[in-house]
A protein has these predicted regions:
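Bacterial N-terminal signal peptides
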Residues: 10-20
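Boundary at the C-terminal end of the N-terminal hydrophobic targeting segment
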Residues: 24-26
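Extended ligand-binding regions for polar small-molecule ligands
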Residues: 28-35, 41, 152-156, 160, ...
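Extracytoplasmic small-molecule ligand-binding "clamshell" domains
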Residues: 28-120, 312, 323
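Short, hydrophobic alpha-helical packing/hinge segments within bilobed ligand-binding/sensory domains
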Residues: 40, 82-83, 106-111, 198-205, ...
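Bilobed "Venus flytrap"/periplasmic-binding protein-like clamshell domains
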Residues: 51-60, 72-90, 124-126, 144-200
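Acidic, polar ligand-binding/catalytic clefts
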Residues: 80, 84, 88, 92-161, ...
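Hydrophobic residues within well-ordered alpha-helices
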Residues: 86, 111-112, 162, 204-208, ...
Length: 363
């Protein structure tokens, strides 16, 4: 009886720890979204589509386009395709998705209150956002850095020449602190022009209310496309910060974060092993076990298909690549050198080509 009593006490203690721990971890998440197994995935499956939060009017990354003469609207861009990849893996349909426009203020609010399932809006992974805001950052999909854009009429070639300049930036991002640190380090005086998140900083710059505009360099290149005179604006050479950008999900929902995380890794792995949307069907019944695992062809008790561990079908990763493409395809068609935005891959190459993109083994 004494031993039995100890067992009961131990079980109660374990349950209490689990409950308290779960509450502490999810303290900034609406109680409705504290998962038993994966509340987000269950809700997504029940409704039949993913809700993705993204920016609007962000050429190359996320923008609602009018297609053809029929006036059909369709979201396009790098961040948009990342969300489509999630839908393709879950439903076998990249269009099983709804896009919710977010800004610097609402993006985290919408994620934490359950308005959106995943945030794909050029969001920088930082310590504070991860630890304090209880956000789960997915693998970095775009390695960036903050820079500056100016009018060529100023005749400058470096941010260090901008003594006394008016510099505009969004009040809701990482730009303000980066700019403060940079100009303090170089002992340069400047006039900060903080733009609230419900306004677009690029419009404040275009109106002439500031001399220089600071944000991620990919954002500068994208926003310059929307200017009526893009050739009259210069992106300066300085890169003043690290800005690892990627998708974000709610903290504490392990199954959902695993699905989104391995969706990103599937894009990297497919490029690494040579699979793309055009050739993937030719790799059926291939002798390479790595390709067999990716195609969902290893079955049986010893080698169950890997999708089963996520609650997905055997062909989840095949569908991602067949229907959306690998990382290289997504990058090149949206922001690559042959697009209007014209961004070289740089750090956003696979590690095998000198970049920072690297996925754990799919095994």
């Amino acid at each position: 009886m004494i031993m039995f009593g100890k067992v009961i006490v131990s079980l109660v203690w374990v349950v209490w720890i689990v409950i308290v721990g779960s509450t502490a971890e999810g303290q900034n998440v609406s109680p409705e979204y504290i998962p038993t197994y994966s509340t987000t995935y269950d809700r997504v499956k029940a409704r039949g589509y993913v809700i993705c939060g993204t920016n609007d009017e962000f050429p190359g990354f996320s923008q609602e386009m009018i297609l053809g003469g029929g006036g059909e609207e369709r979201w396009e861009g790098f961040d948009v395709d990342l969300c489509r990849a999630i839908a393709a893996g879950i439903f076998g349909d990249p269009d099983a998705i709804e896009f919710e426009i977010v800004n610097g203020k609402t993006r985290f609010e919408f994620l934490l209150d359950g308005t959106i399932d995943v945030l794909s809006a050029a969001t920088t992974y930082t310590y504070t956002r991860n630890v304090q805001k209880k956000l789960e950052f997915m693998p970095t999909t775009y390695y960036d850095g903050q820079g500056f854009i100016v009018r060529k009429t100023l005749g400058v070639s470096s941010a260090k020449q901008m003594e006394g300049a008016r510099i505009c930036f969004s009040s809701s991002g990482t730009a303000a602190k980066n700019i403060k640190d940079f100009f303090k380090k170089h002992e340069i005086n400047y006039i900060p022009v903080s733009v609230p998140p419900n306004q677009k900083t690029k419009n404040v710059y275009k109106r002439g209310d500031c001399d220089m505009y600071g944000t991620d360099r990919s954002g500068l290149a994208s926003n310059r496309l929307s200017f009526s005179d893009p050739d009259r604006h210069l992106i300066l050479p300085e890169v003043i910060s690290k800005e690892p950008l990627g998708m974000v999900v709610r903290y504490g929902d392990q199954k959902w974060s695993d699905i989104v995380r391995w969706t990103v890794y599937a894009l990297f792995i497919a490029e690494e092993i040579g699979l793309n949307s055009n050739n993937i069907d030719r790799f059926e019944n291939n002798n390479d076990p790595n390709i067999q695992r990716f195609m969902g062809e290893l079955n049986g008790n010893d080698h169950p298909h890997l999708g089963s561990k996520l609650g997905l079908g055997a062909n989840w990763s095949y569908n991602i690549i067949k229907l959306v493409g690998n990382y290289r395809e997504i990058y090149e068609r949206n922001v690559g050198v042959n697009t209007p935005i014209g961004l070289k891959r740089g750090l956003n190459k696979l590690y095998t080509h000198g970049g920072l993109l690297y996925a754990p083994p799919l095994k």
